[in-house]
Amino acid sequence: MNKTLGYIFQILNPCVEITVSPPSWPEVISTSQNEGLSFLLYRSAIKKNIDIPFPIKQSLKQEYIYNWGRNIRILEELAALLRAFEDPVIVLKGAALLSSVYEDFGLRMLGDVDILVKPADVPKIDKILSQLGYQSDHKQDAYYVTNYLNSLVYGKNGSPLLLHLHWHLINNALPNYIYAEKINMDKLWKEAIPLKIRESDALCLAPHHQLLHLSEHAMKHSYNTLIHVWDIHQIINHGKEKLDWEMICVEAEEFQLKGPLFYSLWLSKEYFGTSVPQGILEFLRPRHKGVGEKIFSGLLRQGKRREKLCWLFYFSHISTVQKKIKFVFRTLFPPRDVLSHMEDIENGEKSFLIWKVALRRLRKALRLLGKAPQEYDD
């Protein structure tokens, strides 16, 4: 771990007293922003009375206030939509976390707002959104309700709210479709719990399901920004008395998410001192790693959280040669409907898009393999 990250983690840890100066305040701020932790850093530093240079402190304060106001506006718009929907909605990730486990609306940036609806309710909700002025680049009736392509993004002119409408918990981003069918969606809906978004009623995932979902999401992004790991830290800290670790392990096995859960919990404990029972980590710890997972694990232990690093992990967990070939092909050459969902392109470019994406992904894969460590630390 580099000194700058180490210093940031000390500031974020309420039990650690800061006794040294940072390597460089500009570097601390830049790193915290890249990791999505700058708002948390600002509030934690204020609580600890850390002497931040005045111009930097003022800049952090202004960014925090702006983010707080933006988040409130987004949540107010989401609350209005929830009142318009007659069907149950599960609010996911950032919006759910800000409304439950975070103590302050300004501590975390909201990107897309993710909501989960039942597949049968998608046409009705799509119609309501359209009537309220929200538009999607893709037509709902052109989508097959599957585990492969299972979401639509809606926006509205002049609104900061970008709504990501899901009808399955696992997003369409490759290669997550491989284990999407293992997720018991009926169980998620049955065990969802009430949530207030401002003054509107909604649902959120039960704590054990939320932990699994956040772990899967963080793995999908190869842990490239630590705010995803901090979300996991927050869920565990907030629910210390309520988390059923035995249930979490059972569901992780059933949903085939033991690997993502292990690496997410390990990173959270390693970086933020999260209270994760050692017996749980030992139960989840991979016993037989393939070459890809050994490289993945070795890079994580070196603090190298690269984009698309998760491909190595996923590749190792595919059982047959035939499925591995399919995985490589689908990763490099996604279906055209998925490509149009992933890329903002002009009509005239469509015939070249598949090759453009394939070459870009191939370069990323070669970059991963080219920089892999020679020895693996288990």
Where on the chain are the PLM-derived regions?
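Conserved NTP-donor binding/palm subdomain of two-metal-ion nucleotidyltransferases/polymerases, i.e.
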Residues: 1-111, 117-378
